[in-house]
UniProtKB/Swiss-Prot annotation:
Gene, per the UniProt record: glmM
Active site positions: 100 (phosphoserine intermediate)
PTM text: Activated by phosphorylation.
One Gene Ontology MF term: magnesium ion binding
InterPro entries assigned: A-D-PHexomutase_a/b/a-I, A-D-PHexomutase_a/b/a-I/II/III, A-D-PHexomutase_a/b/a-II, A-D-PHexomutase_a/b/a-III, A-D-PHexomutase_C, A-D-PHexomutase_C_sf, A-D-PHexomutase_CS, Alpha-D-phosphohexomutase_SF
Lineage of producing organism: Bacteria, Bacillati, Bacillota, Bacilli, Bacillales
Named cofactor requirement(s): Mg(2+)
EC number per UniProt: 5.4.2.10
Source organism (scientific name): Bacillus cereus (strain G9842)
Function text: Catalyzes the conversion of glucosamine-6-phosphate to glucosamine-1-phosphate.
Modified residues (Phosphoserine): 100
Keyword Cell division annotated: no
Record-given protein name: Phosphoglucosamine mutase
Catalytic activity entry: alpha-D-glucosamine 1-phosphate = D-glucosamine 6-phosphate
Length: 448
């Protein structure tokens, strides 16, 4: 991670850390780095439903136009929609304005290259070097060489038509409950599933600029679970603010997380000869039960650091086509170049249709170990990881576990948090281990 770029682009409190002035520079320098070898380059921009999206979009557009780029605004669209359209529309770069599952005051800017993939560390470092220069020495075209802006609000429909083709039959006869987090999928997902002839119930589809992720979406699936039970739905599908995550709910109201969705997809893809190299790529946060279920089905796993960019890097390196995170980022690389909540949802419902099994049965083939994750707000993430007392309590707890479970303590990639996670044979043991570590972290580096 650099000074500006975290694990998922540039993030911060809009108009405080992520200011219009910074957004202008990111547009100008980012646009230059990604398009400098092209005459009259095309850059597309999408955003989620945050109130700050218009402000940052205007600044970004100005920065891009100042380099001579032609800018196409997509309006409100999901992150994977931008990734797909960057390549499909032959753009030199794509930009998404979103802070994903974060609260409304936050926002972020992430770039995609012409291939639809997120930027490499080297590209981000090149942009950061320009941001840190005292004098802007980039070319400043004038007159007819300046860029122009246009709108392509039909882009969302083009993207939906593409992902719709990935399923084998329609969803008639199924009742699907959708939670769109008052975010980027609010107008897209209901249209998609209705178009596939499903009976749908919806929530989180009334964005007002202020309510994105507020008590809804993939970080609050328990709310969708109530709707599933109330409506008697066959499945619930919860997306996050920018539509790159999926958390599901089975017909009984049980939450089905990213690990379980990955396992269901892996098993089906193996059975149908689609799973490349018989391997799934996951992160260190995946549940022990996930690995045991894969092992029982003779499927190999490959483990990375936390963050969908690291999963993607490993997938590209090894030629794998399925990967993801417990949080619901599922990457289906045969179809799209980033985590995609709606695409993952289509595949999950398609598997239900093709196997004629309810989601509870499909998910039930994986038994999760009890797990607890506690976020501790800290003054300094780096200091926390170097603190001797914190290192000592982790060592003591790991010794006591004696291999029957695991502890993971790591910094958040986007917030001033230390995440403390444990898995153990019982919830009681799990909770006790986590709280012992949390108390030491709070005492040593906790923020008020």
């Amino acid at each position: 991670m650099g000074k500006y770029f975290g694990t998922d682009g540039v993030r911060g409190v809009a108009n405080k850390e992520l200011t219009p002035e910074l957004a202008f520079k990111i547009g100008r320098f980012g646009g230059y780095v990604l398009t400098k070898d092209t005459d009259r380059p095309k850059v597309i921009i999408g955003r989620d439903t945050r109130v700050s999206g218009h402000m940052l979009e205007g600044a970004l557009v100005a920065g891009l136009l100042s380099t001579g780029a032609e800018v196409m605004r997509l309006g409100v669209i999901s992150t994977p929609g931008v990734a797909y359209l960057t390549k499909a529309l032959d753009a030199q770069a794509g930009v998404m304005i979103s802070a994903s599952h974060n609260p409304v005051q936050d926002n972020g800017i992430k770039f995609f290259g012409s291939d639809g993939f997120k930027l490499t560390d080297e590209q981000e470092a090149e942009i950061e070097a320009l941001l840190d220069k005292e004098v802007d020495e980039l070319p400043r075209p004038t007159g007819t060489n300046l860029g122009q802006v246009s709108d392509y609000f039909e882009g969302g429909q083009k993207y939906l038509q593409y992902i719709k083709q990935t399923v084998e039959e329609d969803f008639s006869g199924l009742h699907i409950a959708l939670d769109c987090a008052h975010g980027a999928t609010s107008s897209l997902a209901p249209y998609l599933f209705a178009d596939l002839e499903a009976d749908i119930s919806t929530m989180g589809t009334s964005p007002n600029g202020m309510n994105i992720n507020e008590g809804v979406g993939s970080t609050h699936p328990e709310v969708l679970a109530e709707l599933v039970k109330e409506k008697g739905a066959d499945i619930g599908l919860a997306f996050d603010g920018d539509g790159d995550r999926l958390i599901a709910v089975d017909e009984k109201g049980n939450i089905v997380d990213g690990d379980q969705i990955m396992f269901i997809c892996a098993k089906y893809m193996k059975e149908t000869g689609q799973l490349k190299h018989n391997t799934v790529v996951s992160t260190v946060m995946s549940n022990l039960g996930f690995y045991k279920a894969l092992e029982a089905n003779n499927i190999t796993s490959d483990k990375t650091a936390v963050g969908d960019r690291y999963v993607m890097e490993e997938m590209k390196r090894g030629g794998y086509n399925l990967g993801g995170e417990q949080s619901g980022h599922i990457i289906l690389l045969d179809y799209i170049t980033t985590g995609d909540g709606m695409l993952s949802a289509l595949q999950l419902v398609n598997i239900m249709k093709m196997t004629k099994k309810p989601l509870s049965e499909l998910a039930g083939e994986m038994t999760k170990f009890p797990q607890l994750l506690v976020n501790v707000r800290v003054t300094d993430k780096k200091l926390a990881l170097e603190n001797e007392k914190i290192k000592e309590i982790i060592r003591v707890v790991e010794e006591e576990m004696n291999g029957d479970g695991r502890i993971l303590v790591r910094p958040s990639g986007t917030e001033p948090l230390i995440r403390v996670m444990a898995e153990a044979p019982t919830q009681e043991v799990c909770d006790a281990f986590v709280h012992r570590i949390v108390e030491v972290v709070k005492a040593e580096v906790g923020a008020e």
